[in-house]
Amino acid sequence: MDPDEVNQALGHYLNDSESGELVVEDSTTVQVTNPEARKTGDKIEVYYSRKTTVVSPTNSDDEEGEFCSDSELLPAQGGHRSRATSFAGRVRAGSDDEMNPKHTVLRYRRKKGGQWREVNAQGTPDKRKDDEDELEVDVKEDRSEQTGIVTKTYEARWKVLKYEHLPEWLQDNEFLRHGHRPPLPSFAECFKSIWSLHTETGNIWTHLIGCVAFFLLACWFLTRPDNHIQFQEKVVFSFFFAGAVSVSDSRSPSTPSRVIRSTSSRYSANSTIWESRCSLSARLFQPKITYIAMVCVLGIGAIVVSLWDKFSESKYRPVRAAVFVGMGCSGVIPTIHYIITDGVHSLFADNSFHWLLLMAFLYLLGAALYATRTPERFFPGKCDIWFQSHQLFHTCVVIAAFVHYYGISEMAFARLNEQCPVR
């Protein structure tokens, strides 16, 4: 079925109107995500929205109507199973409370090669675990009892998709089999998807929770009295909080993955700069500036690589992880410098280096899980929603950021209390 046939089918099922009703407005929006389907014969995906405004007699004796599916929601034609949806809905007025707006959500599911069936919100997982697709239809009616004007809105869309049904640019992990969020037509739809359950839900919320937590921590830290935390320390720490909040908030529903990687690179560079600044702050000016400049150059290089479209492909996932790890490992050089000048004991006793080691371990662990796609590689289809590698990577990064904050705050307070020697 090509896009023209989809439009015709959708119009056929929704063009019925009540006798005596005068149609004032009837607008339909159909967005086809694969316009080349008529040439290639591939499956297509359709986002369908229709708004109908009619004037009906206010003294009508119509009875409450029903919602029905769309002729089994367009079964296969021409040997290709269609990805398009339509919905035949008819709402009739008659009761006293129908002047209030109505909102009904209907859900349909189907197994592979099967017909669509209507399900309720309490459908048991056992009956739904083998389903291939879920279709969600929003039906809204706004009726004015005084004017007789009725506005009906129908919106049909897929809630989740299988991996094979995603466009190529979203096929990043073939071990996540079901529950993918489809391409959405607007930012509003992307934002609403925060509250739905799909493969990106855990990725979104691990970052959003971290963002809120760091924002609250920043508010507490920056509002401390100056006799506890001096103003210049607040200014310097504000850069750390800005980096932590930005990397935590970078997983909005519409954020491209390359922007996320560039934000992670900025945060990694920020971490190393803080190590150099706090551990060498009482030392000669030149080495500290040299290390900070070195990290800035490496960070810019990592951001450039992260924003390069070529590295957005799934096959470069290990390369992306290696860039992230390499950026973090740049902190080894100032650490070796400190060991040479002050020894290992001072590194741990005066600079809380054990916390920075824990931070590095969490970074490496998260990057390794992300690069190897563990554990979903060993359990395909079992980690589609929870405990997938990307979620674990985000969790490791957020925890590492809190560990990093604690470590550098200990280093900063030790410097303020003049516990580190000046040379």
Swiss-Prot record:
Q: Which InterPro entries match?
A: AdipoR/HlyIII-related, PAC
Respond yes or no to whether keyword Ribosomal protein is given for this record. no
SMART domains linked to this entry: PAC
Q: Which GO terms describe its cellular component?
A: plasma membrane
Q: Which residues lie on this side of the membrane: Extracellular?
A: 223-234, 310-320, 373-392
- Tell me the membrane topology, using the record's own terms: Multi-pass membrane protein
User: Membrane among the record's keywords?
Assistant: yes
Acidic residues composition-biased segments: 60-69
Q: Which Pfam families match?
A: HlyIII
Q: What is its main location?
A: membrane
Q: Any idea which UniProt keywords this protein has?
A: Fatty acid metabolism, Lipid metabolism, Membrane, Receptor, Transmembrane, Transmembrane helix
- For the region Disordered, give the residue spans: 54-140
The alphabetized list of GO BP terms reads: adiponectin-activated signaling pathway; fatty acid metabolic process
Residues exposed to the Cytoplasmic side: 1-201, 253-288, 342-351, 414-423
| Subcellular localization, as worded in the UniProt entry | Membrane
**Its Gene Ontology molecular function terms?**
signaling receptor activity
* Amino acid composition bias (Basic residues), ranges on this chain: 104-114
**Membrane-spanning intervals of the chain:** 202-222, 235-252, 289-309, 321-341, 352-372, 393-413
Q: Which PANTHER family match?
A: ADIPOR/PROGESTIN RECEPTOR-RELATED, PROGESTIN AND ADIPOQ RECEPTOR-LIKE PROTEIN 1
User: Which protein family is named in the record?
Assistant: Belongs to the ADIPOR family.
Q: What does this protein do?
A: Probable receptor, which may be involved in metabolic pathways that regulate lipid metabolism such as fatty acid oxidation.
Q: Can you say what this protein is called?
A: Progestin and adipoQ receptor-like protein 1
Q: Which organism is it from?
A: Caenorhabditis briggsae
